[in-house]
């Protein structure tokens, strides 16, 4: 009888230990916040504001979805790019993309592709020539950023070096670009 009781107790303890085993939801690797002037939580959202054309007033807003509105730290910063970099983003914010723990931003009116860290601190910028036309939208895959250019091209850019590697001619005035199963689709 004692063997049965011992076996039953062992099985109950095993069941209880399995029941209380769980995974932590805070195992995400920390973001690269190097150079930040603002303390930011792990969960964050960036919102690209286009601004008014020809006015150099595009911006990036920051929102902390899990932070209490009464928290002493801001859960919303209207223009985090300006706060972090002490300069305006540029003319006509067009597209924003998170890729490989960085944020890439197309500023169409200023003909720029910006690479920001996860705290919106600028790390690199690529200026497009007037013959390229203004950049519009982007997609990313395998360490490359693909940018549609108003001149009728798609530029392939190395995401780490921010150097243009190649161009592909497409129809005039391409807009959206999407990567799916190793193929790019341009509209």
Task: Provide a role label for each language-model segment.
Residues 2-6, 13-45:
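Bacterial Sec-dependent N-terminal signal peptides
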Residues 32-37, 88-98, 132-142, 172-181:
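Repeated scaffold domains used in trafficking and secretory/extracellular systems
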Residues 45-55, 98, 105-109, 147-151, ...:
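Conserved beta-strand positions in repeat-built beta-propeller and related beta-rich domains
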Residues 66-68, 117-121, 158-162:
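Short loop/turn segments that connect beta-strands within beta-propeller blades
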